[in-house]
């Protein structure tokens, strides 16, 4: 533009002699106008280019979206091709067995027909995608595998095992081509007989094994509840009580060895909790009617067909783990992708990886972390993993592969308090700010604070112990298992047999909760049945004096009012039933939970009730007015809760292994992250200064109220499912998955 101006000035200067100042001023003004016009033109051009750039950016985004969509389709087709290839191989093997039984003429005729069909099938399958494969006697399987390899190569998903598998298939097919040049029928018979003697025999054995596993896994809970309740302890440590933590109360940290520990995968057939899924054959609990998968949401549950059912004191039930359909297992190696790492813990009671204090996971399942804040480069791989589950993986029904990712991420700046160990207790303010808790000097010392717990007795119940309770004064322990409650006298450590056995419910139904009235003369029992049994313990021989029948197929937890006049039962349909114990009638139902009500506790003055449910909510109820007071929404199912006797704090145990201690009148709360599994039960000491929390990780932990300093920890040989504390806070009883209850003496 400057050169143009100089030319303009030169052209105007030479034709005529220089005039007075007026023409010169006119030239400058004209030049300024021209500059202004050119600037406006450039500005308009810039604006146009900017709009075009934005349009291209939006088109790029749209193309990326289409790419991901087509990637999913391609990957799904790839998996479908693998499935079809496997079907073809098996059909070929069957034909190879059947054809030799025919006459010679029929053998040749059928072999020719089979070859024709194989060629046409191969051509029709590969042509639409632009792939052409040479003719093979077993060309369908080879062509399909080659197509799968090509598709996989485009998506960068096949791994070394797949390539090796493909190479072996191609080599075998090339060998079959050479033999086919002599006699198609003879080569077909020879190659298929050879395959029959090797591949088909192994495939048939594998298929039979899979069918047996499926039959065993899909058997009804009513018939297989024993198997479903066996806890896999083959890779767990033996029982060894632990003393107080070595770190000082101000450290608020974990041992590094505990953070670095990796839990061995448990068998899908093994289950962690005593509270099995209620018998689908006879009960049809709300477990199967309207359960929810706890996802990151506040209050809208997502229906599913097999959520866990909680047990006594929020002891969760178990989700049956179906086997893989026949024909899918041989494809497993072909379907593995870097993003589709199989989770070794298929049920909500699998040991949940403990979140590091900066949000990372310390288990093999951590590969799923990238799926939650996934980069654009990995979006296609995530879509491929989703497609794998949709098309070929046949994932476990209701399986939530990200259940361990629901642990709230902890910001990197909250990794710990000075001292070098990561924090496990955090204070969450009203505005959501998380800060590690500096424990006070008296966190682990002082009146009413125990030093450790010593195991003094083992009660061999013989069945998985889902519910326990201690009498007041401390003399008898009641353990609830399968179809009965056993009564133990713990004042005589040498007595290894129960003093009585109370048969209730049906023989195959598990007791989920048992509660003693304050006078110790009446026991109320509930579980996987629609009836509650009321036992008269004061009679010469304990007997059932009444039964309360509700419309719900199961009761998960019980609470008794302080005046012993009213019983509250958590029903599998989400309702809270209120029973008049004197008249033995149903007087009211609190309705609010959209899924099974799993746990319950009542205030000391008997005016307020707290309930937790599988709908990810905790609700409080005014017992005088019969209405709901508050609702707290969480991102995980609620398995247990406890109301502090002092009346200020409510502790909530969740499926995602967190414990949250809420203030009942203020928005402040504490989050505790020390455990590595779902919180199956929770109980406050009667002094209110500490509470215990057993779990699937075989640990019994004692915490300081409310900030959660770890007081002591005891290791058991199996999952700890239920617990109770004596009225004098001197004894703790736990029920576990290895068919026993353990009595601890609390040492102060």
UniProtKB/Swiss-Prot annotation:
Chain positions with Phosphothreonine modification: 293, 300, 302, 309, 315
Coiled-coil residues: none
Domain characteristics, as noted in the entry: WD repeat Groucho/TLE family members are characterized by 5 regions, a glutamine-rich Q domain, a glycine/proline-rich GP domain, a central CcN domain, containing a nuclear localization signal, and a serine/proline-rich SP domain. The most highly conserved are the N-terminal Q domain and the C-terminal WD-repeat domain.
One Gene Ontology term from the biological process aspect of the record: negative regulation of DNA-templated transcription
CcN domain: annotated span: 180-249
Reported modifications of this chain: Phosphorylated. PAX5 binding increases phosphorylation.
Cellular compartments annotated: Nucleus
Organism, as annotated: Rattus norvegicus
Annotated Basic and acidic residues bias: 158-177, 190-227, 248-264
Region (GP domain): 113-179
Biased amino acid composition, Low complexity: 178-189, 265-280
Protein name: Transducin-like enhancer protein 4
GO cellular component terms, A-Z: beta-catenin-TCF complex; nucleus; transcription regulator complex
Subunit structure and binding partners: Homooligomer and heterooligomer with other family members. Binds PAX5, LEF1, TCF7, TCF7L1 and TCF7L2. Interacts with ZNF703; TLE4 may mediate ZNF703 transcriptional repression. Interacts with SIX3 and SIX6. Interacts with PAX2.
SMART domains given in the database record: WD40
Residue positions where N6-acetyllysine is found in the record: 212, 256
Protein keywords: Acetylation, Nucleus, Phosphoprotein, Repeat, Repressor, Transcription, Transcription regulation, Ubl conjugation, WD repeat, Wnt signaling pathway
């Amino acid at each position: 533009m400057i050169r143009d101006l100089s030319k303009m000035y030169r052209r105007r200067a030479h034709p005529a002699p220089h005039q007075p100042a007026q023409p010169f001023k006119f030239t400058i003004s004209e030049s300024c106008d021209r500059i202004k016009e050119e600037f406006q033109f450039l500005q308009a051009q810039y604006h146009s280019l900017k709009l075009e750039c934005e349009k291209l950016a939006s088109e790029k985004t749209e193309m990326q979206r289409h790419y991901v969509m087509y990637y999913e389709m391609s990957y799904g087709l790839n998996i479908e091709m693998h499935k079809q290839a496997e079907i073809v191989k098996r059909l070929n093997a069957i034909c190879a067995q059947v054809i030799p039984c025919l006459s010679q003429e029929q053998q040749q005729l059928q072999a020719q027909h089979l070859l024709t069909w194989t060629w046409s099938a191969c051509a029709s399958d590969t042509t639409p995608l632009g792939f052409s494969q040479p003719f093979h006697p077993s060309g369908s399987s080879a062509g399909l595998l080659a197509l799968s390899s090509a598709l996989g190569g485009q998506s960068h998903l096949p791994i070394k095992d797949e390539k090796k598998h493909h190479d072996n298939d191609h080599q075998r097919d090339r060998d079959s081509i050479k033999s086919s040049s002599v006699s198609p029928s003879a080569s077909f018979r020879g190659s298929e007989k050879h395959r029959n003697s090797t591949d088909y025999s192994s495939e048939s054995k594998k298929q039979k094994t899979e069918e047996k596993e499926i039959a065993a896994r899909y058997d009804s809970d009513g018939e297989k509840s024993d198997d479903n309740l066996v806890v896999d302890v083959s890779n767990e440590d033996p029982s060894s009580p632990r003393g107080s933590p070595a770190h000082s109360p101000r450290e608020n940290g974990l041992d590094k060895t505990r953070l670095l520990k990796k839990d061995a995968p448990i068998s899908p057939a093994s289950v962690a909790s005593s509270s099995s899924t209620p018998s689908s054959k006879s009960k049809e609990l709300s477990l199967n009617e309207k359960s929810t998968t706890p996802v990151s949401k506040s209050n809208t549950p997502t229906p599913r067909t097999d959520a866990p059912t909680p047990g006594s004191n929020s002891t969760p039930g178990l989700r049956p783990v179906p086997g893989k359909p026949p024909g899918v297992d041989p494809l497993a190696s072909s379907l593995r992708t870097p993003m589709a790492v199989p989770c070794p813990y298929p049920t909500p009671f699998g040991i949940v990886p403990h979140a590091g204090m900066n949000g990372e996971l310390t288990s093999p399942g951590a590969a799923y972390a990238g799926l939650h804040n996934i980069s654009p480069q990995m979006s296609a791989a995530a879509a491929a993993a989703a497609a794998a589950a949709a098309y070929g993986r046949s994932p476990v029904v209701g399986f939530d592969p990200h259940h361990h990712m629901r642990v709230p991420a902890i910001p990197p700046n909250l990794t710990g308090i000075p001292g070098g160990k990561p924090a496990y207790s955090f204070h969450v303010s009203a505005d959501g700010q998380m800060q590690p808790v500096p424990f006070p000097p008296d966190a682990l010392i002082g009146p009413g604070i125990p030093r450790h717990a010593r195991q003094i007795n083992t009660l061999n119940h013989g069945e998985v112990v889902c519910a326990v309770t201690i009498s007041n004064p401390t003399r008898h322990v009641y353990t609830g298992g399968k179809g009965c409650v056993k009564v133990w006298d713990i004042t005589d450590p040498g007595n290894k047999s129960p003093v009585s056995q109370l048969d209730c419910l049906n023989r195959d139904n598990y007791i989920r909760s048992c509660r003693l009235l304050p006078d110790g003369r009446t026991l109320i029992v509930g579980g996987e049945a629609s009836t509650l049994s009321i036992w008269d313990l004061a009679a010469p021989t304990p007997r059932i004096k009444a039964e309360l029948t509700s419309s719900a197929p199961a009761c998960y937890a019980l609470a008794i009012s302080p005046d012993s006049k009213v019983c509250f039962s958590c029903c599998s349909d989400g309702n809270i039933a209120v029973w008049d114990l004197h008249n033995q009638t149903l007087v009211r139902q609190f309705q609010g939970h959209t899924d099974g009500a799993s746990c319950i506790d009542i205030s000391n003055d008997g005016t307020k009730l707290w309930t937790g449910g599988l709908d990810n909510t905790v609700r409080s109820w005014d017992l005088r007015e019969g209405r709901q007071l508050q609702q707290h929404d969480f991102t995980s199912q609620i398995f247990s809760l406890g109301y502090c006797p002092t009346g200020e704090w409510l502790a909530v145990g969740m499926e995602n292994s967190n414990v949250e201690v809420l203030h009942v009148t203020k928005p402040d709360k504490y989050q505790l992250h020390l455990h590595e599994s779902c919180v199956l039960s929770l109980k406050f000491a009667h002094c209110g200064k500490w509470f215990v929390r057993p779990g699937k990780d075989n640990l019994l932990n004692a915490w300081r109220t409310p900030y959660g300093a770890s007081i002591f920890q005891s290791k058991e040989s199996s999952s700890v499912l239920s617990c109770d504390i004596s009225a004098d806070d001197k004894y703790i009883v736990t029920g576990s998955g290895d068919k026993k209850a353990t009595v601890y003496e609390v040492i102060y």
